[in-house]
Amino acid sequence: MKLIIVSGRSGSGKSTALHVLEDMGYYCIDNLPIGLLSPLTQEVLDQGKTQNQQLAVSIDARNLYRDLSDFPSIYAALQAHNIDVEIIYLDANDATLIKRFHATRRKHPLSSKSTSLKEAIAKEKQLLEPIATLANLYIDTSDLSIYQLRDQVKIRVIGHKTQELALLFQSFGFKHGVPSDSDMVFDVRCLPNPYWDTALRGYKGTDQEIIEFLKQHPEPEQMLQHIISFLETWIPHFQNSNRTYMTISIGCTGGQHRSVYICERLGEHFKKKYDNVQVRHKELAQ
């Protein structure tokens, strides 16, 4: 049987991820106590379900600390019974989680009169560490919309299931920080910058005006071909090491022009070679 465990801090998008899995045909259980994980899977096996049975559960920090600490041994026991276990761990930066709780006016499950929201979020990270360290898939949802998160979960789960590589090319601005989910980072700040042309400053890297500007210079094409050559050489090696997804980040100063252009070109190229290719522009989504 196939078991997907969805975990992560409150407000990171676990419910959304579980809904995606339900739409994909998984039988889903929300907020399962860790102590019931082994009995549940055993019950499914005892009922004579087929090996194609797909089960997904979410686990959060409301479990007892002792149970969370025991998770690695429970995980190992499930694998010993030939259960195909996959862990999806969702997270976001503290500022984003705080903003989401303020927006929804929900109470954090670990907050109390003596524990502030900020303290509860920090405590939750510590409690979930035994699960986070074993995660097969880590998704940072800080800058993702609900729809982008749904796409991320779907493409990564499908890729993991079929052993088909899923590629995400994302542009970003270094002044906003390097995305924490990056597997590779390419710095394109050395390329000619249309920002300094006041007539072009308001355009984005997907606009024809910026495309034409960058095509007028030899450096962007040269940089692009070098990145393509590097990726075509090394992506197969990552595939051979059982990687089923990769996040390749392209950064310029503000994430508006050069990185967007290069990212789009990379997406166009690799969509001809791989079925699961996504392009995302982190700063344009703001």
Curated annotation (Swiss-Prot):
Amino acids binding ATP: 8-15
GO molecular function, one term: ATP binding
Signal peptide: none
Protein origin, superkingdom: Bacteria
InterPro entries: P-loop_NTPase, RapZ-like, RapZ-like_N, RapZ_C
Pfam families named among the record's database cross-references: PapZ_C (PF22740), RapZ-like_N (PF03668)
Cross-referenced SUPFAM superfamilies: P-loop containing nucleoside triphosphate hydrolases (SSF52540)
Positions of GTP binding: 60-63
Keyword annotations of the record: ATP-binding, GTP-binding, Nucleotide-binding
Classification via NCBIfam families: PRK05416.1
Described function: Displays ATPase and GTPase activities.
Protein family according to the UniProt entry: Belongs to the RapZ-like family.
Name listed for the protein in its UniProt record: Nucleotide-binding protein HCH_05324
Organism, as annotated: Hahella chejuensis (strain KCTC 2396)
